């Protein structure tokens, strides 16, 4: 009923504006007073994110019952405890190689005694010599220190990594006090 009353009031105002034009500036002022109201109020759509359906949440009437029950994180069978600390992680700090018998041959040799051609395997090593101090076992040969001492007696000079290296500006005298 209220919407029909406001619609008829708007119609009367428009009729009043059309039948009684006074001067041009007041007519424009009164012409801008026309109000249109709509009574439809729509709520914003709500997006509900749900994991895989387990049957109990599908059978619920409002879709929210049963969402929190029975859900827990489960590690996949191939996720390993890569640091030997009893914690499984999906983010690994090195590539895990399953232990294999000593007499089993492989295409890749991971022992340092077989690699006599180079002192360095190309991997990045932290400065200071003590490294990350985490234990991977005897089979771990992936290029970062484990805090077990100096290792080989002859080490090559450490080169700076990308964050420590100073950029080389060619053609610009940035470091000189010229002008």
Curated annotation (Swiss-Prot):
Q: Which GO terms describe its cellular component?
A: nucleus
Q: Identify the keywords attached in UniProt to this record, alphabetized.
A: Nucleus
Naturally occurring in which organism (per UniProt): Sclerotinia sclerotiorum (strain ATCC 18683 / 1980 / Ss-1) (White mold)
Q: Does the keyword Hydrolase apply?
A: no
* Ranges of Basic residues composition bias in the record: 143-159
Q: What PANTHER family does this protein's entry cite? A: E3 UBIQUITIN-PROTEIN LIGASE PPP1R11, E3 UBIQUITIN-PROTEIN LIGASE PPP1R11-RELATED
| Function of the protein | Regulator of type 1 phosphatases which maintains protein phosphatase activity under strict control.
**Biased composition, class Acidic residues, residue ranges:** 104-121
Bias (Basic and acidic residues) occurs at: 131-142, 170-179
Its name, as the record gives it, is Type 1 phosphatases regulator ypi1
Task: Give GO terms: molecular function aspect only.
Answer: protein phosphatase 1 binding; protein serine/threonine phosphatase inhibitor activity
Q: Work out whether the entry's keyword set contains Nucleus.
A: yes
The family line of this record is: Belongs to the YPI1 family.
Region Disordered, residue ranges: 1-179
Where would you find this protein in the cell? Nucleus
| Gene from which this protein is expressed | ypi1
Q: Which Pfam families match?
A: PPI_Ypi1
> Polar residues compositional bias: what residue ranges?
1-43
| Listed Low complexity bias regions | 52-64
């Amino acid at each position: 009923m209220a919407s029909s009353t406001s619609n008829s009031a708007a119609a009367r105002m428009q009729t009043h504006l059309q039948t009684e034009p006074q001067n041009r500036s007041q007519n424009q002022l009164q012409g801008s007073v026309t109000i249109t109201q709509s009574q439809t109020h729509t709520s914003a759509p709500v997006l509900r994110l749900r994991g895989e359906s387990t049957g109990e949440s599908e059978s619920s009437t409002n879709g929210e019952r049963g969402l929190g029950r029975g859900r827990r994180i489960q590690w996949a069978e191939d996720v390993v405890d890569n640091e030997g600390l009893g914690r499984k992680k999906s983010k690994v700090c090195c590539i895990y190689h399953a232990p294999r018998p000593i007499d089993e041959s492989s295409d890749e040799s991971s022992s340092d005694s077989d690699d006599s051609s180079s002192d360095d395997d190309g991997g990045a090593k932290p400065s200071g010599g003590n490294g990350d101090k985490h234990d991977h076992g005897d089979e771990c040969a992936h290029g970062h220190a484990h805090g077990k001492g100096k290792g080989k007696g002859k080490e090559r000079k450490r080169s700076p990594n990308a964050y420590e290296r100073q950029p080389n500006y060619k053609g610009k005298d940035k470091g000189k006090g010229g002008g």
